[in-house]
Amino acid sequence: MPKETGEKLIVQNKKARHDYAIEDKYEAGLALTGTEVKSLREGRASLSEAFISIDRRGEMWLEGANIPEYLNGTWNNHAPKRKRKLLLHRLQITKLARGIEAKGYTIVPLSLYFKDGRVKAEIALARGKKEFDKRQALREEQDKREALRAMRYANMRH
């Protein structure tokens, strides 16, 4: 089987992009079991309840992410919601740890994807949005969509 190249998106966390203002993005590797990778190849995963924590030893963990059991797996299948270790350079972890010490900042998982056959997680240092900010962002998005629709309609008439 030829080696896989390029990137293939598995799952996105749309809720994170809505609830948080993204500051810095990072790419992290994931320490997974074989059945987890097979389940991800089938596109089965959810990041809606996922969050990232840093323990006392300075290791980052992806928690709350749901990777369902592999359908063809046997007794050695993985636990769907287990903690999964994120693989980053020590300096990146230190920078993120300093970032979340500031009030209102957190680390959120944005997406999971395959890159050259390996599972990667896109994570971000983010600041929580207030309800007003969320409504304003939605309004701006709708206005932009309506403007595009109006321009498209005007171009069709000529």
UniProtKB/Swiss-Prot annotation:
Gene Ontology molecular function terms on file: RNA binding
Keyword GTP-binding: no
PROSITE patterns in the record: SSRP
Keyword Cytoplasm: yes
Superkingdom, taxonomy of origin: Bacteria
Compartment(s) of residence: Cytoplasm
InterPro entries (alphabetical): SmpB (IPR023620), SsrA-bd_prot (IPR000037), SsrA-bd_prot_CS (IPR020081)
Signal peptide bounds: none
GO cellular component: cytosol
NCBIfam families: PRK05422.1, smpB
HAMAP family: SmpB
Official protein name in the record: SsrA-binding protein
Organism lineage string: Bacteria, Bacillati, Actinomycetota, Actinomycetes, Bifidobacteriales
Gene (UniProt): smpB
